[in-house]
Regions:
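Signature aromatic-anchored transmembrane alpha helix within multi-pass, membrane-resident enzymes
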Residues: 215, 332-351
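Membrane-interface transmembrane helices that cradle and orient dolichyl/undecaprenyl
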Residues: 162-176
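Transmembrane-helix motifs of polytopic, lipid-linked glycan transferases
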Residues: 113-129
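Alpha-helical transmembrane segments and terminal signal-anchor/GPI-anchor hydrophobic tails
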Residues: 34, 51, 70, 75-79, ...
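Transmembrane-embedded, aromatic-rich helix segments that form part
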Residues: 178-180, 190-201, 212
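TM-lumen/periplasm interface segments of multi-pass membrane proteins
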Residues: 20-115, 352-362
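Short acidic/glycine- and proline-prone juxtamembrane loop motifs at membrane-interface regions
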Residues: 150-156
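Transmembrane-helix signature of polytopic, membrane-embedded enzymes
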Residues: 126-143
Length: 362
């Protein structure tokens, strides 16, 4: 499974490498607020790209359908399918899952439906909204495709829809945004978190304020003064009960933060200080960076509540797909060195991806 996946990912990235060129990435017309990844391409030029996107989607969908039954969550979904969706046993299961189970005569067809929707929405979001299509594919294939589309398939559909919907925050189109978030919520309830985020800053971010918040979160995380520790001193029963549900007790042992957590936080600060230049070429930069910052804050502030840290960090972390891709836009002069930095950030996650594929990840 690992060899097949790496071969497929390498083939996709080699064939799409021309999309990383300066000519393609800087094709957006700065005078237009509405962003199009291939804005200056004529219809005849776009068609082969979209055909290629379709072929990429087909290959990835096949990987999802015929994945190993040793992957995390595979047995759970197979058991739920046999129980008709598990609607009588799990009250938290979404109605969409029960509906798709009823529409699927076999478990493989269920996997095919979910894969088509999740991979399709991700590819559509990338080719529509990404500041650098090739780099977004690198981020997606190096980690999030395996984590979400191949394992957490319900949340994958919701996040794919949100990747497309983010453009409506900048365009100030509340109805299509809320409609898409509502559809995403039908596939996974955690998408409700994105409803109020329509009102996040969309024009600019104060680099000093947000850098200060990130640095404070770094200090709290590395000194074991994160949310779980602070919650000990809040005399509110429901907070105590909520934290206990994740920890099981009030003896907090922080998950060890590695150098990667600090590195990702400093990437956010770098993007903040270069946001003005990035926005010139990528109008969606502010909400994308906001989601990326939220992700990093979750990783740092919930370090002593590993379940929340992973769930929320990975949820908002999906926007790494765009955040890492906009990193090279900080400087046209140093575009290619910065692109290498983005690639190296992705390579840090490849060992985890291999473990997920092998079914050995903890």
């Amino acid at each position: 499974m690992e060899i097949i996946y790496l071969a497929l990912a390498a083939t996709i990235l080699l064939l799409t490498l021309p999309l990383s060129s300066l000519k393609v990435v800087y094709s957006h017309d700065e005078s237009q607020q509405r962003y199009e990844a291939l804005a200056r391409w004529k219809k005849g030029q776009r068609q082969p790209v979209y055909i290629g996107a379709g072929l990429i989607a087909i290959g990835l969908i096949a990987m999802c359908i015929f994945r190993s039954d040793e992957l995390a969550d595979y047995q759970m979904y197979e058991n739920l399918y046999r129980m008709g969706g598990g609607e009588n046993l799990r009250q938290d299961i979404e109605a969409s899952f029960v509906t798709i189970v009823k529409l699927s005569p076999t478990f493989l067809i269920l996997l095919g439906i979910y894969a088509t929707l999740s991979v399709g929405s991700h590819i559509m979001g990338i080719f529509k909204n990404s500041p650098n299509i090739w780099l977004s594919l690198v981020v997606y294939l190096s980690y999030y495709f395996v984590l979400h589309d191949m394992i957490q398939m319900r949340v994958a559909i919701g996040l794919g829809i949100i990747l497309y919907a983010v453009r409506y925050i900048t365009e100030r189109k509340i109805l299509p945004y809320m409609l898409l978030v509502g559809i995403a919520f039908w596939f996974h309830k955690s998408m409700a978190l994105f409803l109020p985020l329509y009102f996040i800053p969309y024009k600019n971010l104060n680099k000093w304020v947000w850098s200060g918040i990130i640095l404070m979160a770094l200090v709290m995380g590395y000194t074991n003064n994160a949310f779980g520790y602070v919650a000990k001193f809040i005399p509110v029963d429901f907070i105590d009960a909520y934290v206990r549900s994740y920890l099981g007790n009030r003896d907090y042992v922080a998950s060890k933060l590695g150098i990667q957590s600090a590195l990702m936080a400093f990437v956010a600060i770098f993007l903040l200080f270069n946001l003005k230049e990035i926005k010139r070429h990528y109008p969606l930069a502010v909400p994308v960076l906001m989601f990326y910052i939220i992700s990093q804050l979750c990783y740092l502030l919930f370090v002593d509540i590993p379940v929340m840290r992973a769930r929320l960090g990975e949820l908002f972390g999906t926007f790494d797909i765009f955040a890492f891709a906009m990193l090279p836009l900080a400087s046209k002069k140093y575009y290619y060195p910065l692109m290498i930095v983005s690639i190296l950030l992705c390579l840090l996650r490849v060992p985890i991806t291999i473990e997920l594929l092998a079914g050995t990840a903890m």
